[in-house]
Amino acid sequence: MCHSKEVKFKTNFHHPYTPYDIQLEFMRSLYSSISDGKIGIFESPTGTGKSLSLICASLTWLDEHGGVLLEDNEKSNDNKSNTSSKIPDWVLEQDLKIQKDLVKETHARLEQRLEEIRKRNQSRKNQMSNNSTTYHRETKRRNINAEASTSDNCNNSNTSVDPMDEYLVTAEYTMPSTSEQSEDLFNNGYSSKVSELLRKLSPDNEKPPIVQKIYFTSRTHSQLQQLVQEIKKLNNQTFSTPIRVVSLASRKNLCINNEVRKLRPTSALNEKCIELQGSAHKCPFLQDNTQLWDFRDEALAEIMDIEELVELGQRLKVCPYYGTREAVDSAQIVTLPYPLLLQESARNALNLTLKDNICIIDEAHNLIDAICSMHSSSISFRQVCIAETQLQQYFLRFEKRLNGNNRMHIKQLIKVVYNLKSFFLNCLETNTNSKVINVDSLLVSNGADQINLHHLSEYLNVSKLARKVDGYTKYMHSLGTQELESLNDLRSERFSNGNGYEEDPYTPVLMQLESFLLNIANPAPEGKLFYEKQTGDNPYLKYLLLDPSKHVEILTEQCRSVNLAGGTMSPIDDFITLLFSDEQSRILPFSCDHIVPPENITTILVSQGPAGVPFEFTHKRKDDENLLKDLGRTFQNFISIIPDGVVVFFPSFAFLQQAVKVWEMNGITNRLNAKKPLFIESKDFGDNPLDTFEHYKQSVDAGLSGMLFSVIGGRLSEGINFSDKLGRAVMVVGMPFPNSQDVEWQAKVSYVEEKAKEKGINAKQASQEFYENTCMRAVNQSIGRAIRHRDDYASIILLDSRYNRSSIQRKLPNWLSKNIHSSPNFGPAIRQLATFFRAKKMCD
């Protein structure tokens, strides 16, 4: 544990630049969180160097306090003392000392090998600069040879074998006992042969030491790529040893087998990879121990991102997907996407050690929704109909060749699918819109209530039936008309249900069905099953996880410190109550000011328009023409003052579309467009919102300015930076509260109220807080990307009288709430805006 005074004045965090005061405060706070075993919640606005601060503070602590983890050895020593009380203590202590010395020696040998690789790589780089043509020619030749080898291994097959054999289910499945689960059942992609190979990778005396590490996770691979680039900025020489980093990713991102990586969907790619491990023509990149060792050491010797790991795998002809896993034990930083850390099955498959390690979750503003989404699944009526068609056709084709066990389970699955379809049809006939249901109500006919969904789900996992059926369906689709006639006949039969649509029966849906059955076979008490009907005749069933706390509990119990970070974490109450309610004494909140001076930001609350129409953009006032016309006049006034680009966020597409419709009818659109070209985000699936943003950006960059209309929660509200001229003003129309009539939202609210009652808290107050927090987190995320650097400036304009409530203003980020200008009338708002930009123009 560190001394608070020492941390308070600590300045050396190995930062590559001279850090600002707010960055020093951030790093000191994170350092303390790790040292004291806290759960940190860090808010650092976009543009304040958050990622680099996270890296520097955590690596500094690790360099000063971290070390080799000897947990396994110490446990072994404890076992010796428990089982053999006759062994003197001094013998046990000596044994532990020998083990520690051995680990240190192994660690030293690892560092020696890595240093030799670094020198060799530097020599290679020097040669490249001297003779780049030769190097590229050799690289190209190696890649061509690797592709040829891949093609030969994947396509070489025994021509005497019936092509149908590939799709026949042959797996033997027996219902496991409680104490005896198949080791390969939940291994998330490792075949037994690969698991054995990885277990036997090295003899004990050459196994790399397990070192204390930082698990750094974020939502997307691109965010993790950026993180690795930030780590590269650090000067290795200032640390006691060069930084060892490894990036874990999915097969889709790391596979170098060209015949496999092109497969879609991702589930097909995963299944093909596993299949090639056990086949006679195994993947040529799944190499033996020595080559895996080489990959591991090369990956640790230099800081590599995903693309560089793929290039390394191609150069060494070793699978990066499995090779990176061998580097985890000795890495100081492991970067990985959310699912690999937050799903238990993924952690077990990767054999990740949580105990005493440090966990940093970046871009954590949507962590609650992300965890719930990972452990939820849905299936639509159309998908169920397609699944029934495909399963019946598959069963007709292979029934006589299936053994009794497989025949029984496939018939059970068909029965379950039939019951799902019957449930949908009954809901459609009774015009049911939405409701919460229980699993038992889905399985009511033909003896389906006697089927053990848990065992059936396990059978699907072991047998790989979904891949077999999807593969067979694609194969049938590729054949001539004679084979297609039977499927087309089935299509006519299956889909002549009066619903006015036909669906292509060749669409792969069995993987989706398997995922859905897995969830309803193991329903968590904190989850709910819903029936939903939105538009048309394609309702869906959805299993939704309501309480994510169980999935972070193991992190807080085992990790030394868990730290959440984001540009806009406010309001943080939900993180505490929904994720860490039993760990509140460990919570360390931190929110820093923005890097820009206060005079570069103005926040204006607008309660009414120029005509005096009160601004309260509720759902029931969506069609209020007077309200929308006065909103248009407000924009006309504002954009006469605001230079360059203006971004406007609406609470929903329906609100945006209705506003544009009213403006077009009253000539407001033309008047707006005369001052600034208008760009409107579309809801249409075929339109790419990034194209809209690119056109807006081109207009602003060309000096024509622009006004971009977007939607909170849409593609343009996250991940895009509206810095400098792209966002001299960011406006938010209304407040994006969730739909209180939505059945899923009602279930979430009920769950929050139940939990509040259990803790003796006012239930209605808790649900109201949850309601407001959900809204304000979305608002904060949308407006948080306007300022990107110290010299940037922008106005934040919130158009709704409800923003004047003190309970709402408290949920704004600290850096934004310190300079709020509010008035009941429109005049002061326009004057404040003019004053702000007049001052900025004088500075320019």
From Swiss-Prot:
It catalyses: Couples ATP hydrolysis with the unwinding of duplex DNA at the replication fork by translocating in the 5'-3' direction. This creates two antiparallel DNA single strands (ssDNA). The leading ssDNA polymer is the template for DNA polymerase III holoenzyme which synthesizes a continuous strand; ATP + H2O = ADP + phosphate + H(+). One of its GO terms (biological process) is DNA-templated DNA replication maintenance of fidelity. Residues 9-418 form the Helicase ATP-binding domain. Residues 118-161 are annotated as: Disordered. PANTHER family: ATP-DEPENDENT DNA HELICASE DDX11-RELATED, DNA REPAIR DEAD HELICASE RAD3/XP-D SUBFAMILY MEMBER. ATP binds at residues 44-51. Keywords: ATP-binding, Cell cycle, Cytoplasm, DNA-binding, Helicase, Hydrolase, Iron, Iron-sulfur, Isomerase, Metal-binding, Nucleotide-binding, Nucleus. Belongs to the DEAD box helicase family. DEAH subfamily. DDX11/CHL1 sub-subfamily. The gene is chl1. This is ATP-dependent DNA helicase chl1. One of its GO terms (cellular component) is site of double-strand break. Residues 124-134 have a biased composition (Polar residues). SMART domains: DEXDc2, HELICc2. Pfam families: DEAD_2, Helicase_C_2. Its cofactor is [4Fe-4S] cluster. ATP-dependent DNA helicase important for chromosome transmission and normal cell cycle progression in G(2)/M. May have a role in changing DNA topology to allow the loading of proteins involved in maintaining sister chromatid cohesion in the vicinity of the centromeres. Has a specific role in chromosome segregation during meiosis II. Residues 149-160 have a biased composition (Low complexity). It is an enzyme of class 5 (isomerase). InterPro entries: ATP-dep_Helicase_C, DinG/Rad3-like, Helic_SF1/SF2_ATP-bd_DinG/Rad3, Helicase-like_DEXD_c2, P-loop_NTPase, RAD3-like_helicase_DEAD, Rad3/Chl1-like.
